[in-house]
Each structure stands twice: as C-alpha cells, then as structure tokens.
C-alpha cells in the first residue's frame, strides 16, 4: 500500500505538555524544562495496521479562552490532538472552548480528535477526573487517553488512535466506528 501523509495539529492551553508529547513521540525523550512554543513541526513515519503513514505534526503555541482560533490550523489538517493537563481544571475548560471554535471555523459537526489528559504521573495533583475526560470525549465522538509525556505512557497510542479515526472518516473503516475510549 502506498504511504499516506497525514497532518495533525496539537492544540491546548499553555504548558499542558503539547511539545513534550511531540518530542516523546518523535524523539523518544522527555526534556524537563519549559520553553513556550511559537510553532514547531515534527515528522515521523508510523505503521498502523500494515499501512505506512508520514505523520506531520504541528505543535502550536498554547491558546487560552480569549484566543481567536488560528485559521491556518483549520486548513489541510486531517486530525487534531486536544491536550489538557489532569492537574489543571482551567486547561480542561480551555480545551472545550478550542473544540467549539474548531468546529465553528471548519463549519463541521465532526472532526477527528483525540482528547488527551496529560501529566498522569502527577496523580497527587489531579483536579480533572478520568470520568470527566471520558464524558467530554464521548460527547465529541472522540478518542480519549490519559498520558504522561514524562513517563512515556500511552504517548504512541494518541497518534495510532488518531490515524484510525482519520481513516474511518475517509470511509475506510478499520475499526468499529464511534467512540474509542481506552
Ligand atoms: N510531570 C510532568 N510534566 C510534564 C509532562 N509533560 C510536560 N511536562 C512539563 O510541563 C511543562 C510544559 O511542557 P510543554 O511540553 O512545554 O508544554 P506546552 O503545552 O507545549 O506549552 P506551550 O508551548 O506554552 O503551549 C514543562 O516543564 C514540561 O517538562 C508530563 O507528562 N508530566
């Protein structure tokens, strides 16, 4: 099968771990320092269910509830990773606002999305429950994962699940449609 190219945008509030998830996925390492992103791109070859993909990731600058949705991320993207930190209720609220804006800008009712609750290694500081995350993802018909970029927990699954959702949207169902919850 010929290799397919898929463009994925990482979005969410500041400091939730978007860059760390990209770096962990692409380079297999965790950098314990904080350098706010303006915009960064990463490329990785991934194989899912015998299909090779060139995954182009765009790591966006953190957004907040007042940000205007950056229109450039609504065009030529196949899917989105919306990230919050399980230690920040604010980041959970912001991800809901980003999702609404995304649908609005794209003029669509459905967009392939994986909702990610990151930083699960900081479980003692958790303020967003797994149940809240799951419910939100179900309401979006999105996949849901809790991850740790630091401990490399479920990071690869984000991109595998998103590639499957994108494939399903393109009329090539490889898995049962509907909500993918792990
Ligand atoms: N404990 C823990 N810290 C994390 C994790 N992921 C990221 N961090 C830390 O959180 C801080 C912010 O991480 P970034 O990856 O820069 O976050 P970002 O969402 O890209 O931030 P912006 O560029 O401002 O949007 C850094 O100090 C990271 O080391 C994680 O899974 N666990």
Swiss-Prot record:
It holds the Pfam family Ras. One of its GO terms (cellular component) is cytosol. A motif (Effector region) lies at residues 34-42. It catalyses: GTP + H2O = GDP + phosphate + H(+). PROSITE patterns: RAS. One of its GO terms (molecular function) is GDP binding. It comes from the Eukaryota. Keywords: Cytoplasm, Endoplasmic reticulum, Golgi apparatus, GTP-binding, Hydrolase, Lipoprotein, Magnesium, Membrane, Metal-binding, Methylation, Nucleotide-binding, Prenylation. GO terms for biological process: apical protein localization; carbohydrate homeostasis; cholesterol homeostasis; G1/S transition of mitotic cell cycle; insulin receptor signaling pathway; lipid homeostasis; multicellular organism growth; negative regulation of autophagy. Gene3D superfamilies: P-loop containing nucleotide triphosphate hydrolases. Belongs to the small GTPase superfamily. Rheb family. This is GTP-binding protein Rheb homolog. The lineage of its organism: Eukaryota, Metazoa, Ecdysozoa, Arthropoda, Hexapoda.
């Amino acid at each position: 099968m010929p290799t397919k190219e898929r463009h994925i945008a990482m979005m969410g509030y500041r400091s939730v771990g978007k860059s760390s998830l990209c770096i962990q996925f692409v380079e297999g390492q965790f950098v314990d320092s904080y350098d706010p992103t303006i915009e960064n791109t990463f490329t990785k070859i991934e194989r899912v269910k015998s299909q090779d993909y060139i995954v182009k990731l765009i790591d966006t600058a953190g957004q907040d509830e007042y940000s205007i949705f950056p229109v450039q991320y609504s065009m030529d993207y196949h899917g989105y990773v919306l990230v919050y930190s399980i230690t920040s209720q604010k980041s959970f609220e912001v991800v809901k606002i980003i999702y609404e804006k995304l649908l609005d800008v794209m003029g669509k009712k459905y967009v392939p999305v994986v909702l990610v609750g990151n930083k699960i290694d900081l479980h003692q500081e958790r303020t967003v429950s797994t149940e809240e995350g799951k419910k939100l993802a179900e309401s979006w018909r999105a996949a849901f994962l809790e991850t740790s970029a630091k401990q490399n927990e479920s990071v690869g699954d984000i991109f595998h699940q998103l590639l499957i959702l994108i494939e399903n949207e393109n009329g090539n169902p490889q898995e049962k449609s509907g909500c993918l919850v792990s």
